[in-house]
């Protein structure tokens, strides 16, 4: 099945029948729309990326692709747009209404979002690098590279752990050392 929703009682709510995807984002994207929405990418070389109502499965936007769209991302990275922005390898950047606001942006990570620099926008974590999207110039700026540290799971490039460990609402990143002998906890100095 994949691309399905399970209700609070454990029963299936719906299936889009679009199969498995490597990334799915569930949140309240659009402040003017009731309920939660889903941004999902599909590996079936047909359905591309879909933005849908989480409760009903109604597709709000679909960007079809004949490729395996293995990665998509959603985070609030542009303060000029209400709600959460979304993008994928194939879709360019969309606002919470599903409208195109930027084409494919070179180097825009599609891996993880992190609260790093203390402002209300998200930063982007990919491998051992944290970047910030510059919405004015529509480009990505590197904030920090964690030298001597590696991510996990090959192409998935995920940290050992990411979360607010210190308790200041920013998030810390836990990575393994290159020699696999230790774990390193990185804390924002911004």
Located regions from the model:
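Extracytoplasmic/lumenal domain signature
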Residues: 1-190
């Amino acid at each position: 099945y994949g691309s399905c929703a399970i209700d609070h009682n454990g029963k299936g709510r719906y299936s889009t029948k679009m199969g498995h995807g490597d990334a799915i984002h569930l949140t309240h994207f659009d402040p003017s729309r009731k309920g939660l929405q889903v941004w999902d990418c599909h590996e079936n070389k047909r359905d591309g990326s879909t933005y849908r109502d989480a409760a009903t499965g109604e597709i709000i936007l679909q960007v079809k692709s004949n490729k395996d769209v293995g990665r998509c991302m959603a985070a609030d990275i542009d303060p000029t747009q209400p709600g959460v922005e979304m993008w994928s390898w194939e879709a360019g950047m969309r606002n919470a209404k599903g409208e195109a606001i930027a084409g494919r942006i070179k180097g825009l990570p599609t891996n993880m979002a992190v609260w790093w620099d203390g402002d209300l926008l998200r930063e982007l974590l990919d491998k051992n690098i944290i970047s910030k999207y510059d919405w004015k110039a529509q480009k990505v700026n590197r904030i920090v590279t964690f030298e001597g540290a590696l991510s996990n799971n090959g192409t998935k490039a995920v940290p050992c752990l990411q979360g607010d460990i210190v308790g200041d609402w920013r998030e810390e990143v836990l990575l393994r050392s290159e020699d696999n002998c230790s774990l390193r906890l990185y804390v924002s100095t911004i």
